[in-house]
UniProtKB/Swiss-Prot annotation:
GO cellular component: cytoplasm
Keyword Lipid biosynthesis carried by entry: no
Gene (UniProt): tig
Protein name: Trigger factor
Signal peptide bounds: none
Entry EC no(s): 5.2.1.8
Chief place where the protein resides: cytoplasm
Annotated source species: Salmonella paratyphi B (strain ATCC BAA-1250 / SPB7)
Enzyme class: isomerase
Length: 432
């Protein structure tokens, strides 16, 4: 076997291989012997068919199969010998073949980039230092009560957190526009559902009032004909309702799994959940900064084949989220996923090099801790832990999570890490 390797462009490689004629003939004869043992031909017993008849009937197809097998095996031998690491599926380009002559073919593919990590010492990471305070717990309890609130009609003016029922008609330059009119529209104030200025224009008015407000559509508004346009809305305010928050009664508290129904028990449960969320948020914040720094410090070429493969993964995930099938997934425009796919491939290659250079392996104690932490959010943690322990795929996924964490920690060990006091609310809003 003769082998030559050339660089086509960037990460592209072409391996040209020549297989000696005698190697081909030896393999063909060997395969014909195997075929002769199995075939049945009228007039001959099984395994007793003369070789010349077997060759006459099956020689062409056997030769084709043998060539395909030799091309594959010789390519594998070549990349092992040349220490080449292909990325993605290779493209075989066969040359002209004549029986009794050497056979030359080429294989085109991309290789993984040679990653040499640099700049880890210059990465800056700001680690949030946060405590869950009693005030944070109070806010969360209010949120829980608001989620369970009922609405009661009131006579006064609409406030920032009230709910209103309105009719409205919008116009731009005196002309009504599509989607700018509604009847008995129920609007919960303070959720940012409407364009800027709309809710402010409703606040302070009472049921039974009709009034006009002036607003401006944002420049990034989805409707092209309305971007940045000044508009008027004629509004008929039909009903104003305010929230009635439930009291922290024993019955209410037990809805959240607090068996003794006490306020102290509810506060303890809420605090525990908030601290679990906080731990994850801090970890994610630090991780995202470390990875961002790693990417900025290491500009690497990325094999197109890996990006294409990642795009297909993202397409399928998107289709699953919205109830689509395989065919619909592959029809989604690649432009929607290209940037994210490239980013994921780059991060994977860089973290892979961190893992390789630091000789990291998944820490089983960390894996166990991650599963226990995740399971604690469920009603029966033991059942979840047992379910994971019996599922190889889930366990492998969690090992990958642990290994990624260990890689990030290896980056952080060399990075410049500082601490910054932050509130619970500020950190969680950054995560949103």
């Amino acid at each position: 076997m003769q082998v030559s390797v050339e660089t086509t462009q960037g990460l592209g490689r072409r391996v040209t291989i020549t297989i000696a004629a005698d190697s081909i003939e030896t393999a063909v004869k060997s395969e014909l012997v195997n075929v002769a043992k199995k075939v049945r031909i009228d007039g001959f017993r099984k395994g007793k068919v003369p070789m010349n008849i077997v060759a006459q009937r099956y020689g062409a197809s056997v030769r084709q199969d043998v060539l395909g097998d030799l091309m594959s095996r010789n390519f594998v031998d070549a990349i092992i010998k040349e220490k080449i690491n292909p990325a993605g599926a290779p493209n075989y380009v066969p040359g002209e073949y004549k029986v009794g002559e050497d056979f030359t073919y080429s294989v085109e593919f991309e290789v993984y980039p040679e990653v040499e990590l640099t700049g880890l010492e210059s990465i800056e990471v700001e680690k949030p230092v946060v405590e869950v305070t009693d005030a944070d717990v109070d806010v969360m309890l209010d949120t829980l009560r608001k989620q369970q609130a009922t609405w009661k009609e009131k006579d006064g003016a609409a406030d920032a957190e009230d709910r209103v029922t309105i009719d409205f008609t919008g116009s731009v330059d005196g002309e009504e526009f599509e989607g700018g009119k509604a009847t008995d529209f129920v609007l919960a104030m303070g959720q940012g559902r409407m364009i800027p200025g709309f809710e402010d224009g409703v606040k302070g008015h009472k049921a039974g009032e009709e009034f006009t407000i002036d607003v401006t559509f944002p420049e990034e508004y989805h409707a092209e004909n309305l971007k940045g346009k000044a508009a008027k809305f004629v509004i008929n305010l039909k009903k104003v309702e305010e929230r009635e928050l439930p009291e922290l009664t024993e019955e209410f508290i037990k809805r959240f799994g607090v068996e003794d129904g006490s306020v102290a028990g509810l506060r303890a449960e809420v605090r525990k959940n908030m601290e679990r969320e906080l731990k994850g948020a801090v970890r994610n914040r630090v991780k995202s900064q470390a990875i961002e720094g790693l990417v900025k410090a290491n500009d690497i070429d990325v094999p197109a084949a890996l990006i294409d493969s990642e795009i297909d993964v993202l397409r399928r995930q998107a289709a699953q989220r919205f109830g689509g099938n395989e065919k619909q997934a592959l029809e989604l425009p690649r432009e929607l996923f290209e940037e994210q796919a490239k980013r994921r491939v780059v991060v994977g290659l860089l973290l892979g090099e961190v893992i390789r250079t630091n000789e990291l392996k998944a820490d089983e104690e960390r894996v166990k801790g991650l599963i226990e932490e995740m399971a604690s959010a469920y009603e029966d943690p033991k059942e979840v832990i047992e379910f994971y322990s019996k599922n190889k795929e889930l366990m492998d996924n969690m090992r990958n999570v642990a290994l990624e964490e260990q890689a990030v920690e290896a980056v952080l060990a060399k990075a410049k890490v500082s601490e910054k006091a932050t509130s619970f609310n500020e950190l969680m809003n950054q995560q949103a």
